[in-house]
A protein has these predicted regions:
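Short, acidic Ser/Thr/Gly-rich low-complexity loop/linker segments typical of extracellular
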Residues: 444-461
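Periplasmic peptidoglycan-binding/anchoring modules of Gram-negative envelope and division proteins
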Residues: 519-553, 576, 580, 636-640, ...
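Periplasmic OmpA-like peptidoglycan-binding domain that tethers envelope proteins to the cell wall
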Residues: 346, 351-353, 554-674
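Short, conserved micro-motifs composed of acidic
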Residues: 24, 99, 106, 110-112, ...
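Short, ordered, surface-exposed loop/turn motifs in non-cytosolic proteins
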Residues: 302, 431-445
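A short, solvent-exposed beta-strand micro-motif common in secreted/extracellular proteins
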Residues: 469-480
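A short, amphipathic beta-strand motif
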Residues: 30, 420-429, 502
């Protein structure tokens, strides 16, 4: 991993703890390089000084400084090499075991890191950091095995073998990012790295979804020195960024443009220019400026995030965001979403290694506890400059994770859209045979709008579903009773294809006896035990909304014809009334009392017999009542399947597509086009 210079990525301004130094010029030079944030050169210088025998009493401390310098410059492998040598020699400072473990973790060497954390726990019992880090590694490894909808890919078209980072939305269809590529301004290389100084570059997405080649921002915004990531006003006419001057000091600047060219930047001062500032980000309403600083008033240690309110043409005094956001470690790279949420990178909050991205919301004047945005946005490396479109479905981040072309690269992230489908297969309930040309209706609950279609030659039909939605299905076919099914995408976190088989029963040509439809003696009142069978009939009618039926009631022969006809008609009407009460259209039902006109045919003594009164009275006395009971029955006959009735539900044409990830530049209207 290459070193990225100065405050733009590390913001580690804190001076090193004072050495009990001898008058050693090489050591002083190494310290000066560190103070100038030339961390790569400082690490090399400290490492060389550690070989000086005259400083043998300070050797371990100087080696720690070398490793720290490499870490500040994101040179984890070099830092790791220093720690390995110290551990092999047996360090006096037990913190070396922890530092070594941290470097191993940042490089993804988890088992080795756990071994060093355990060693640290042995030599420093009761510490909180070691066990916490081991737990974090376990959570990271567990999280890596979990499925996710977030896809992170290297934005290769813009990345080079140099540092490319800090992408931000610009105008309607562009981005601006920082790069140290060959096209950057400035003829002199940066001390310590030999690389170009960083500049701000722009690129635009055209109507054909093609990106233009990155070019430096026009005008006077780029200097011969390092420019940091930029934030823009909504109309795109002001840019806020940080610049390192020739002395290595870093401050905030604003540049304005009235046309295509940017004007010379003007310094924005806070704290009387006594501290260095970086990573400015302007709120969507342009009224609040967020930035990073250290050694500033009200700090909590390490790097902190501050904000300042606009006041006329200037700014009020900056204030620290407080201990909910800032820790004793480093918090930096603030980004403010259109929603007002704050995204920032932290080494102090619980994470996976290096800088992790966190998100916090303003509620009742206070920031909520920061939430780690999770894998794979975060990694064991450093993950910073996280930006998102309005729907939080797409955006960019910068990272030096595995797969980078240079030290830091721009990465694009996207939440893949949820996609749900249901494949319905319709079969004959009795034979299992597939049924083409069956009508399947998919009802959206709870409003019951529906889409419908016919099964194909395989007896199947496919529907797209919305996310977090419940559906009911209704299947009908000529000469078959209908049936229902259900499918739900509620609480489904990932795309899914549902499969559902619904069987429907053929309508028999003869009438059907409705079992257990019972009445009070000599009455049309339905007995309570009839309700179960009646509810089954209601369900059948609901599942077959086009069905028309006849309800036929029969009596036995032990009364006058007139009495039996009247009683059976009333009983048939009672059944129809029950169905009407339960929402079945009366126009679909014909009640008819048949009295004793149609005796039942039953199997008696091995033969099918018509249960006339004469036949029953010839049977043994103990059998006669049961045979009379068979005649007292209620039957159903299907009269047709052509009922249309009143349209209660709205048919929806076409398919319901799942929501996509949204445009990268959705809702952007600020600034002119390219």
């Amino acid at each position: 991993m290459k070193r990225i210079s100065v405050l733009f990525l590390t913001l580690c301004f804190a001076g090193l703890s004072a050495f009990a130094q001898k008058d050693n010029k090489a050591l002083k030079k190494a310290q000066t390089l560190y103070d100038q944030e030339q961390f790569f050169a400082a690490g090399n210088a400290f490492l060389e000084v550690s070989k000086d025998k005259s400083l043998k009493d300070q050797k371990e401390e100087i080696q720690i400084k070398a490793a720290q310098a490499y870490l500040k410059g994101f040179q984890y492998k070099k830092a790791l090499s220093v720690y390995e040598g110290m551990v092999a020699a047996g360090p006096k400072n037990v913190e070396v075991f922890f530092m070594y473990a941290e470097a191993l973790r940042s490089l993804g060497q988890f088992d080795a890191a756990i071994a060093q954390y355990n060693k640290y726990n042995e030599v420093n019992p009761g510490n909180a950091q070691g066990p916490s880090r081991i737990k974090e590694i376990g959570e990271f490894k567990e999280g890596m095995n979990k499925p996710t909808r977030v896809k992170v890919t290297n934005f290769g078209r813009f990345n080079t073998r140099f540092h490319d980072y800090g992408a931000n939305f610009y105008k309607k269809n562009g981005i601006v990012f920082v790069s140290k590529r060959e096209e950057a301004a400035g003829k002199k290389p940066e001390a310590g790295t030999g690389e170009k100084f960083s500049d701000l570059f722009e690129a635009f997405l055209d109507k054909n979804n093609k990106w233009s080649s990155p070019t430096p921002l026009k005008g006077m915004i780029n200097s011969p020195f390092n420019e940091g990531a930029a934030s823009f006003t909504k109309n795109g006419t002001q840019a806020y960024f940080s610049v390192a001057d020739k002395t290595g000091k870093i401050y905030l600047y604003v540049s304005k443009r009235a046309s295509a060219d940017w004007e010379a930047p003007e310094k924005i001062s806070f704290f009387g220019d006594t501290v260095m500032l970086a990573n400015p980000y302007l709120s969507n309403d342009g009224k609040t400026l967020y930035f990073s600083a250290t050694n500033a008033p009200g700090g909590y240690g390490g790097i902190d995030i501050y904000s300042a309110k606009r006041k006329g043409n200037g700014w009020e005094d900056a204030i620290n965001l407080g201990p909910i956001i800032n820790t004793s470690n480093d918090e930096s790279f603030p980004v403010v979403h259109e929603s007002g949420d704050l995204m920032f990178a932290s080494k102090g909050h619980t994470g996976y290694g290096g800088y992790d991205v966190f998100r916090s919301s303003m509620k009742d004047g206070s920031w909520s506890a920061p939430k780690n945005v999770g894998l794979p946005i975060n990694s064991t490396a450093d993950d910073i400059y996280y930006i998102a479109n309005p729907s939080f479905s797409r955006g960019f981040l910068s990272s030096n994770r595995e797969g980078t072309k240079g030290g830091f690269d721009v990465w694009e992230w996207e939440i893949t859209p949820l996609e749900f489908n249901v494949l319905v297969t319709v079969k004959d309930d009795s034979t299992g045979k597939i049924l083409p040309n069956a009508t399947v209706k998919l009802y959206l609950l709870p409003d019951s709008s529906f889409r419908d279609g016919m099964t194909d030659e395989k007896g199947q039909i496919k529907f797209k579903l919305k996310s977090n939605t419940e559906y009911a299905l209704l299947v009908n076919k000529d000469k078959y009773f209908g049936n229902t099914g259900s499918v739900s995408s509620k609480n489904e976190e990932f795309s899914k294809n549902f499969e559902l088989t619904i069987g429907i029963a053929p309508i028999p040509p003869q009438t059907i006896v409705l079992e257990d439809i019972l009445y009070d003696l000599n009455s049309a009142n339905l007995r309570p035990e009839s309700e179960k069978s009646l509810n089954i009939l209601v369900d059948l009618m609901r599942k077959s909304p086009n069905l028309r039926i006849g309800i036929y009631s029969h009596t036995d022969s032990r009364a006058t014809d007139r009495y039996n006809d009247s009683l059976s008609q009333a009983r048939a009407q009672s059944v129809v009334n029950f169905l009407i009460t339960n929402g079945i259209d009366s126009a679909r039902m014909v009640p008819k009392g048949l009295g004793e006109q149609k005796p039942y045919t039953a199997l008696v003594n091995g033969k099918m017999e018509l249960l006339t009164e004469a036949f029953i009275l010839k049977q043994p006395k103990d059998k006669q009542e049961a045979l009379f009971q068979l005649n007292r029955r209620t039957e159903l006959e299907v009269l047709g399947s052509d009922f249309e009735g009143n349209i209660k539900y709205k048919r929806v044409s076409g398919e319901e597509d799942s929501k996509g990830a949204g445009s990268l530049f959705e809702g952007r209207t600020g600034g002119d086009d390219k």
